[in-house]
Curated annotation (Swiss-Prot):
Pfam family, one: Hydrolase
Gene Ontology MF, one: phosphatase activity
Alphabetical list of InterPro entries matching this protein: HAD-like_hydrolase_domain, HAD-like_sf, HAD-SF_hydro_IA, HAD-SF_hydro_IA_REG-2-like, HAD-SF_hydro_IA_REG-2-like_cap, HAD_sf
GO cellular component, one term: nucleus
Family, as annotated: Belongs to the HAD-like hydrolase superfamily.
Residue intervals passing through the bilayer: none
Name of the protein this chain belongs to: Uncharacterized protein YMR130W
Length: 302
């Protein structure tokens, strides 16, 4: 078969569909959920309550440098530096607003705002996808593989998704492993098999790999990382930021600066309205796919 291959939603057939899914893991931020408004707009909304006048564009421009330096100075959200993740994020907020002096109460309010639906939006297609998937494949194991810290658990509970993935959540902070390293996917698979030993009654480990899928919004961390581990990687590109779906393959690659901006500059309401119009799937190789929404992805797992 020649790649890349574009598959319109009305052209799916058995030849295009993949093996029955046994394990599907998801990235977290900008995959399961996203911010309703760009992050720095939300920071400024809180800031105004405390008399802090800041421009969201200025804070957005500050963010990549602040984020990069903080990761270098306090790796893994401060895990090895004697500070808790909440303190790590407090430092980030303070440094993003610099040279403005901001009160601790304001930082605490920002942190609380990002613990649930005040800031975040769960895409409607996720809920439908999970429900339909479980209906068609009741034994499929769902998990999360994410480069994040344990504050994530509180958020996941507050937005009603914790029970869906409980028992199969793999965070870089806890494992000292991170995407795109194949080791975090290998760890996830080994852990799932240890908790679900019945899988080995029917399949070998190598055979199970043919039924493992990971869905996420980053080319390197999610699509390529999963494929390198022997999984099928699915890039959920709601904004066509990589250009695959619009045939703009000449789009510049997302460097560290652009990826940092991607993390914070999303308006999920606008994104949702736009990505539902794209209904094609792009198959890049035998184990790499690109979709713009999860409704399209349902065709992959009939």
């Amino acid at each position: 078969m020649t790649y890349p291959k574009r598959i319109p939603i009305n052209a799916w057939s058995e030849v295009h569909r993949v093996a029955r899914p046994l394990i599907i893991t998801f990235d977290a931020y900008n995959t399961l959920y996203a911010t309703k408004l760009p992050v720095m707009e939300q920071y400024c909304i809180v800031g105004r309550k405390y008399g802090i006048k800041a421009n969201p564009s200025t804070l957005t421009n500050n963010f990549p440098h602040v984020f990069k330096k903080l990761k270098e100075d306090y790796p893994q959200y401060g895990k090895y530096s004697g500070i808790k993740p909440e303190q790590w994020w407090s430092i980030l907020i303070r440094n993003v607003f610099a040279p403005n002096e901001i009160p601790d109460e304001m930082i605490n309010e920002i942190l609380m705002r990002f613990e649930g639906f005040d800031s975040y939006f769960v895409y409607p297609d996720l809920i439908k996808f999970l429900k339909d998937l479980k209906s068609r494949h009741p034994d499929v194991i769902l998990g999360i593989v994410s480069n994040t810290d344990p504050i994530f658990y509180k958020l996941l509970k507050n937005i009603g998704l914790f029970e869906t993935f409980s028992g199969h959540i793999y965070l870089s902070y806890e494992l000292n492993l991170a995407k795109p390293d194949r080791a975090i996917f290998q760890y996830a698979l080994d852990d799932i098999i240890s908790k679900q030993p019945h899988l080995l009654e029917k399949y070998t480990r190598e055979e199970i790999l043919q039924h493992c899928f990971h869905i996420g919004d980053e080319l390197k961390n999610d699509l390529e990382g999963a494929e390198a581990a022997g999984w099928t990687g699915i890039l959920l590109d709601r904004n066509d930021k990589y250009g695959f779906l619009s045939n703009s393959i000449s789009k510049p690659m997302r460097d560290e600066y652009k990826l940092s901006i991607d993390k914070i500059d999303n308006n999920s309401i606008n994104t949702w309205e736009a990505n539902t119009k794209q209904t094609d799937t792009l198959q890049l190789s035998e184990r790499k796919y690109v979709v713009s929404n999860l409704e399209v992805l349902e065709e992959l797992f009939p």
